[in-house]
Design a protein with these regions (language model features):
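C-terminal edge and immediately downstream basic/flexible tail or linker adjoining helix-turn-helix-like DNA-binding
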Residues: 5-9, 164-183
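Internal acidic/polar
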Residues: 81, 89-111
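N-terminal module of bacterial RNA polymerase sigma factors
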Residues: 1-28, 35, 183
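Hydrophobic-face residues of short alpha-helical interaction/recognition segments
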Residues: 29, 33, 58, 71, ...
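Helix-turn-helix DNA-binding module
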Residues: 123, 127, 138-155
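DNA-recognition helix of helix-turn-helix
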Residues: 148-173
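Sigma70-family region 2
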Residues: 12, 51-66, 86
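Conserved RNAP core-binding helix
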Residues: 21-22, 30, 40-56
Length: 183
């Protein structure tokens, strides 16, 4: 959450506040944009455009919820514009309409926030545990990981166990929330 010490307007023309907003929302907005464009690089490019426009406009917001809603809507609209433009360029626009309900928009917004939260929790792991776990997720065996990282297989197992325990503990509440939402 943004530092809400100051009460009043959130002004994006202030460099410090803009940087704070950028760092707070970029990851979640990237996952949100990827739901539309299906390409991380394109999603990042679109987000850069959105943040440049926000900086140039220097918008002011009454509170963080107003800012957050605005950011998600602008990113969604930017993604939809990109999709339409891409379709036109490829001359496949015939019959293409983007239909989206408010419910699916909120659902996608929540999913993007959840992915960002999971990513943040994963980043909390110690480097050694995270590296071993990533290689395991890539489908590598204990032996392959041990050879690549020059550590013992027992150490690999210990890192994976520690990572699993930490992730299980940190994600339990999130899992219950996701099940409640039906995600």
């Amino acid at each position: 959450m943004l530092n809400e010490i100051e009460v009043g307007l959130i002004c994006l023309s202030e460099r410090k506040k803009f940087k704070e907003v950028y760092e707070e929302y970029f990851t979640a907005l990237k996952y949100f944009a990827m739901r539309y464009v299906k390409d991380e690089e394109v999603a990042c490019d679109l987000l850069q455009d959105v943040f440049v426009k926000l900086w140039e406009k220097g918008d002011r917001f009454e509170n963080e919820m107003q800012l957050k809603t605005y950011l998600y809507r602008v990113v969604r609209n930017h993604c939809l514009t990109y999709i339409r433009d891409t379709q036109r360029k490829e001359k496949r626009m015939e019959g293409f309409e983007v239909e989206e309900t408010e419910e699916s928009f909120v659902h996608q917004m929540i999913e993007a926030e959840i992915y960002a939260l999971i990513n943040d929790i994963f980043e909390e792991l110690p480097d050694a545990c995270r590296n071993v776990y990533m290689k395991s997720l890539e489908g590598k065996s204990h032996k392959e990981i041990a050879e690549e990282l020059h550590i013992a297989i027992t150490t690999i197992k210990k890192h994976k166990t520690n990572a699993n325990n930490y992730l299980r503990e940190r994600l339990m509440g999130l899992l219950c929330f996701m099940m409640y939402l039906g995600i």
